[in-house]
């Protein structure tokens, strides 16, 4: 870790600084007067349930230094993901499954060797991770929801828990490939999170460390003025440039 990254972490202790680079040069771009319910609540069953659900402040800021967008009002550990069923999404949709198959095939054909150790953070129902079972028998998934359908996937070593940096204490084999889909936007300290992956990953034969990340595109949100995409569930709103800044700062 370089000196600048250490300074960044110290600066981020100030809640008014950027959560990636630590800069205090930030500006609010979206701060509605009304508080928002969590988007994961979906539709409530009754009118009274809708009125009584918890609501949260949303103050989206942009960092002038690294260009990252984030919710300044987000409180760490304010959302629990361990008490809900995972809706990994469209398991019975042919189009969605075809899309997942194409994505997995691209990863297998271009990045993986036989018997690589694959780790997925926030693996949901395990459908995507299971698509690599024809390439390796070492598939490890972390998913905090105890109601995940992943328990039915015998090909996967499942941990019904949040992923923590002490992963190496529980596994003899270091991962060769890490997958994280629609997780990073929920993480309150993304730089430390990505640095953890860099330190635990094995290098491939090209001396590369491989990390696959999917996040919602804030570029599309900004291009279409779609401010409904700003809600409390997401700490971060990544653009291509801010995500690149993050993973480069972490050592990749």
Predicted features by range, described:
Residues 88-103:
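Conserved SAM-binding loop and adjacent beta-strand
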Residues 52-60, 97, 187, 237:
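Short, solvent-exposed loop/helix junctions and linker helices
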Residues 91-92, 184, 230-234:
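The substrate-binding groove and active-site-proximal loops of carbohydrate-active enzymes
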Residues 26, 104-225, 235-252:
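Conserved SAM-binding loop
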Residues 46-52, 226-240:
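Acceptor-substrate binding/catalytic loop of class I
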Residues 88-90, 114, 227-229:
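A short, structure-level motif marking secondary-structure boundaries and short turns
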């Amino acid at each position: 870790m370089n000196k600048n990254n250490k300074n960044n972490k110290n600066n981020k202790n100030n809640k008014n600084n950027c959560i990636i680079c630590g800069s205090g040069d930030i500006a609010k771009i979206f701060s509605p007067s009304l508080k928002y319910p969590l988007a994961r609540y979906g539709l409530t069953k009754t009118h009274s349930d809708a009125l009584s659900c918890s609501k949260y402040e949303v103050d989206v800021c942009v960092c002038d230094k690294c260009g990252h967008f984030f919710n300044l009002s987000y409180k760490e550990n304010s959302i629990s993901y361990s008490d809900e069923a995972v809706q990994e999404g469209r398991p019975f949709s042919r189009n969605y499954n075809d899309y997942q198959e194409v994505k997995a095939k691209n990863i297998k054909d271009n990045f993986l060797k036989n018997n690589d150790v694959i780790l997925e953070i926030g693996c949901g129902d395990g459908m995507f991770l299971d698509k690599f079972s024809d390439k390796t028998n070492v598939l490890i998934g972390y998913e905090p929801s105890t109601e995940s359908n992943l328990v039915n996937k015998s090909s996967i070593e499942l941990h019904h828990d949040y992923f923590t940096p002490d992963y190496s204490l529980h596994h003899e084999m270091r991962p060769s490939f890490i997958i994280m889909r629609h997780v990073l936007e929920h993480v309150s300290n993304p730089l430390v999170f990505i640095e953890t992956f860099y330190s635990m990953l094995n290098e491939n034969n090209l001396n590369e460390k491989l990390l696959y990340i999917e996040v919602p595109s804030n570029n599309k949100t900004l291009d279409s003025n779609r401010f409904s995409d700003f809600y409390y569930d997401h700490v971060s709103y990544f653009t291509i440039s801010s995500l690149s800044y993050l993973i480069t700062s972490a050592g990749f």
